[in-house]
Amino acid sequence: MNREKTIYGEYFHYPAATDWEKISARPHLDTQQLAEVVKDVLADIKANGDEAVRKYESKFDHVELDCLKVMADEINEAEGLIDDELKNALLTAYHNIYTFHESQRFQSHHVETCPGVDCWQKSMPIEKVGLYIPGGTAPLFSTVLMLATPAKIAGCKDIVICTPPNKEGKVNPAILMAAKIAGVTQIFKIGGVQAIGAMAYGTETVPKVYKIFGPGNQYVMAAKQHVSLTDVAIDMPAGPSEVCVIADDTSNPIFVAADLLSQAEHGVDSQVLLITTSEMMLDEIIAEIKSQLEVLPRKQIAVKALENSKFVLVHDTAEAIAINNAYAPEHLIIATADYKELSEKVVNAGSVFLGQYACESAGDYASGTNHTLPTHGYAKAYNGVNLDSYCRKITFQYLSRQGVDSIGHAVVTMAENEQLEAHANAMRVRLTNL
């Protein structure tokens, strides 16, 4: 195998299976150091509430806030600042996201496991959820739709958003418009670690929630993981955003380069992985990346991200999909002639985009699938956000006298053998009263 390091990441030519671990490696995150940084901020917010939140908003977001909550007149004002084209785009995306997530409703049914024993499940919404919406270099108003829409469908009573304000104390108007469309109940001008702490612990102004959703930088992710240890559930662990593209000699190099760059512009720690069966296609894609980079407003971010990226030449698409399954990407684009066949072989991925025309951007915004997905290899064990993310399944069982007769002796025997006599007796007294 030839391995070459360039400004556009690493090139792997016909890697052996022993090299797949190198290909799958992500940039190292010092989670211990991050935990040390965030825990003091979280402890301060837990102890001092709004006062601490305002202090950190001043320190980190460089804004002095008299009121942390976004008021109704600010939301109405924001609607007037959104042009019709963006408003219609938001409504289109909302419709598709709603349609897809509405189709995921749980259908309960009763199961008689044996005579007289009736079991079933009931899906119940999480009553209070908190959604973190990043601001920073690119305010993610699309994430509002992705997180709030399924929460509303699920029936969550309190849907709380925290998002950082600008230096004038204003929230991005598109974020406010998306929140109104999706049915968010409360919005707060809080960013970063302090937002996670406010939602996890509750303050005088911000209600405590039961589960926190949403992306963020490494400090936000560390804060989410810290509060999840004792105080609140979170959607999933997460790292920098990533994409894997599988291409062959039928792929369109312009499309593939655009897909890779759309991921690279997310942030300097984003990662792109290209796996192709064609050396000529690889060369054409690299040339297209160079060309398209020149007109990108976020060129410097994309160039830095490409330094973390990998370009892999393999013998066939079966090998390509095997490397993908080892990598377990957040996004997988299969832009090959045999995309249907390969789609059946996908084991590990957050979301999959099939064919020449399914760009990642479609799922990021408006196809209807959710863009909040597991990263950093967590797709091996986690799925992306869906309707079930906002629900709990409660199990029920009913035993008649016949049911006691059906399973009673098995229950007593098992309890006695685990030396839990009170467990055995709870069933034994029922058996003796049939």
Language model segments and positions:
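Conserved NAD(P)+-binding/catalytic subdomain of aldehyde/semialdehyde dehydrogenases
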Residues: G183-Q271
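A glycine- and small/hydrophobic-rich beta-loop-beta segment
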Residues: H266, L274-A349
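Flexible, glycine/charged-enriched surface loops at secondary-structure junctions
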Residues: F106-V111, A233, S270-I275, V295-A305, ...
